[in-house]
């Protein structure tokens, strides 16, 4: 359950300093290579039971202190990354034989190498902007897939940027007046937590 937003992660410059870290080794751990990150993107894909797909365009995610700051579409990536990320997301959904909406997050390094960072078999926070950017949101597509409803071709109807409102910032947004092309979605969490 750790590993998101930088939780449970420790930078290790040498294997010699593993003993100095506050890690419960009985629970196991993973050592990962540090990627010289250029950017992160998400591919949201919906796989239907007839093995057909609807794939949203790549979404670019920008983080601050390892927490999502905002997501935007279209992502600023080259055609090679566009094709490869969509292909890999499709292959992952197919190998899992997954029905529904799935997110595959990718890291892009400074040499334009692509790495799978996360596979989330569900609707995903980076895809919430599909509500206003597409004719069919990730949520509706998920329901369509799992309930075997008609598949409708995706059409992007607007560029979009989604700001991740965390902690007590929520009170500012709850009282803000929004322009015609701005939308606010409040999950009405009972407890406001710092950095969540």
Please name every model-derived segment.
Residues 83-104, 120-169:
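Active-site "cap" helix and flanking loop/linker of ATP-utilizing ligase/carboxylase catalytic domains
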Residues 28-32, 102-103, 152-153, 195-196:
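A short linear hydrophobic-aromatic micro-motif
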């Amino acid at each position: 359950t750790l590993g998101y937003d930088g939780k449970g992660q420790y930078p290790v410059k040498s294997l010699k300093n593993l003993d100095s870290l506050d890690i419960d080794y009985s629970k196991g751990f993973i050592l990962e290579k540090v990627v010289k990150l250029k950017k992160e993107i998400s591919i949201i894909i919906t796989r239907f039971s007839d093995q057909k797909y609807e794939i949203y365009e790549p979404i670019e995610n920008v983080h601050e202190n390892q927490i999502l700051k905002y997501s935007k579409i279209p992502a600023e990536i080259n055609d090679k990354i566009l094709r490869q990320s969509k292909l890999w997301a499709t292959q992952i959904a197919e190998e899992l034989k997954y029905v529904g909406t799935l997110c595959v997050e990718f890291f892009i390094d400074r040499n334009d190498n692509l790495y799978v960072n996360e596979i989330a078999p569900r609707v995903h926070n980076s895809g919430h902007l599909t509500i206003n950017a597409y004719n069919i949101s990730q949520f509706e597509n998920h329901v369509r897939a799992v309930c075997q409803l008609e598949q409708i071709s995706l059409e992007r109807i607007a560029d979009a940027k989604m700001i991740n409102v965390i902690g007590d910032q929520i009170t500012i947004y709850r009282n803000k007046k929004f322009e015609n092309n701005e939308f606010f979605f409040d999950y009405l969490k009972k407890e406001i937590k710092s950095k969540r």
